[in-house]
Structure formats: C-alpha cells, structure tokens
Amino acid sequence: MDPLWLLLLLPLAVASGWYASRREMPKRAGDEEFNLPSAYFKGLNFLLNEQPDKAIEVFIKVLEVDSETVEMHLTLGNLFRRRGELERATRIHQNIIARPNLSNSQHLQALFELAQDYFKAGLLDRAESLFLELADAPSHAEQALRYLSQLYEQEKEWEKAIAATRRLQKYSEKNISPVLGQYHCELADICLDRQEYDKARAHVDNALKVDPNSTRATIQLGNIEFRIGEYQRAIDTWRKIEEMDPRYLGEVIDNIVVAYRELEDDEGLREFLTNALDDYGGPKLLKAQVEEIQHRQGRDEAVDFLTDWVRKNPTLHGLRSLVNLKNMELNSTTPESELEPLQTLLVSMFDTDGMYRCRQCGFTGRTLHWQCPGCKGWYMQAPVTDEHLVKQTN
C-alpha cells in the first residue's frame, strides 16, 4: 500500500471511530460501555489489508453526513481528487451539497471542492458556473477568481481573463499587472494576424498602461509601426528594449536591419549593430553584424571581423559562427571542406541557436512562448546563452 495513502487514511479512520463511538455511546450518565459499529472494524480491516478503496467505501457509510461530519467528508473527497478518482470525489461533494442542514460556510466550501473536481475533470462549463458563483462570496472570491483566470487562459478567452484578473487585483497582495498585460498582448496578436492595426494598437496601449515595462508589448508596438511603414518609429520603439530587457533585442534584430535599409540609413545601421553587439552580445546580434559586413564588404572582411571578435570574446556561438563561415568559404573552392566534421560536432553538441529556456521550470524549445507550455508561467522564457551551456556540460 502507498505509505502516503496510509498516512492520509489513518486520521480518517480514527475520526470515523471517534464519531461512531460517540453516536453509539449510551446517554445515561456514568454508563461507560459503548459499542462501535461492526462496519468500523470492517473498514479498519480493509485498511490494514491494503484495500484502501473498500475501506473508504465503508467509512463513507459509517459517517452520516451532518454538520459534525462535513469536514471529514470534504477530506475524503479531496483524497479521491488527489488520487485522480474524480467521479468518486464529485459524488461525495454533490452528496454534501444536497444535504439541507449545512451552514453557509460549509455549503460554499463544498461548492468550491466540487468546482475543483469539475475543473480537474475538464468539465470547464460546470466549473466556470460554480467559480462565478463563488467569486461573489468574500470567503472564496480570491481562490475562485484565480481558478477563473486559469480556466479562461486554458480556453484562450482573453477578454474574460482580463475581467477576472481585474477583480482578482482587489484581493491579491501579489502584483498581477504583468499577467494582465499579457492578456492584452494576446488580444493584440490576434488583431495583428488579422491586420487590424488600430485595434492591435489599442490592446498594446492597454498592456503598457498596466505594465509599462512590458517587453512583449513594446515588441508588438514596433511591429505595428513596421507594418504600416513607419520605420523610424519602429526602430525607436524597438530600441526601448535595450533598457527593458536586452536579451530580447535579438527577436527584432532582423526587422531593425530591414527598417534601417528602408530608410537608406547605412551609417545608422552600422553604428547600431556595433554598439548593440558590444553592449549585449548574443548569437542573433553577432549574426546580424557578420551578415551586414559580408553584405557591404564581402566574405573575407566578415571572416576577418569574426576571427578578431572570437579572439576577444571567446564564446561557443562565436566559434560556431566562425567555423560555419570558414566552411562556406572553403566549400566555394573545394568539393568538401576539412572543417565539416568540426562544424557537425559543434552543431550536435552546442546547437542552441534559436533556443529558449524557462527560468522557472527549465522547459526548452525553439519557439519563444510568452506563456511557458510547461509551468504556464508568463514571461519566463529567454534565449539560451553560452552560460547555460557551460553549466549544462559541467
């Protein structure tokens, strides 16, 4: 038998015995004799013989649902839910709610437990209905609103998520404005996909109102300016990322290059790339700088620049970029480069270009998710760096 189950069930068994003995105890003063129901001993026997399911069924029968046993029944229902037996948990909680003699607090707690049963079972419509009812009860409002936010996130009903989270702000001591900003950003993304730029801008403005330092909203605002041809405003907007979180500058570097070229501002582009690479580094900024040099001055100059840069900044992504570029140079003159095995080795061992890692749960992938697929945390993923690799290989 699972030791955890034994620890959880023993208190229930003790409580059952106490309650049963209390109900069977003679009412005459001084009469010390009492008899426990045989069902109680039967339940203990099932428990000791590692048959917890049968034991639980017996204890349910022993414990009549009234004002004195509600807490024990709620505990029993929770045990079922933790174990994944949602039908049994639901049945117990529905049975409690059906009793006419519950106090208001007991009724609300039973509703909350039943709502959690539905939520875990994926019966989201039923869960939503109960959580909405509980959100109007001061004793359960905060917990119910948190579940509603999760539910609406899961269903991608962002308007409802915003409404629930705004209500939650009244109860929560934690700053949840960044999460509220992310919901507005989700709506902005939908409008961007539909090319509804005015609506997208309105959602981005709302995101920045609740979270002025939102990197995601700043990226989106730059994207709007870029798509409508306001290239200088796009550049100015994206460059604010340098002050917010420069790790994400690589997410917009390609469009920044295009914007400078559309403005025919080659000098501005060279200055920006040089300063950004010196200040922040990173594989995407290095790649953009090398490609720009190769575009303006040719491959030889790009190789010379990259060789010098790797010498001064010995990083894995720099070495990999240099080997790739040298291999391209050799392949242009010979059928097969002697650097190909090294290139293959570096890629197989340290292929982190375009990879992101969640700082909360460690989830890793090649797509930037503003909400981590693993832990569901918002704004937890960031580009993988050489420092991550060194720690991993050590």
Name each model feature, range by range.
Residues 37, 71, 105-109, 143, ...:
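Start-of-helix register in tetratricopeptide repeats
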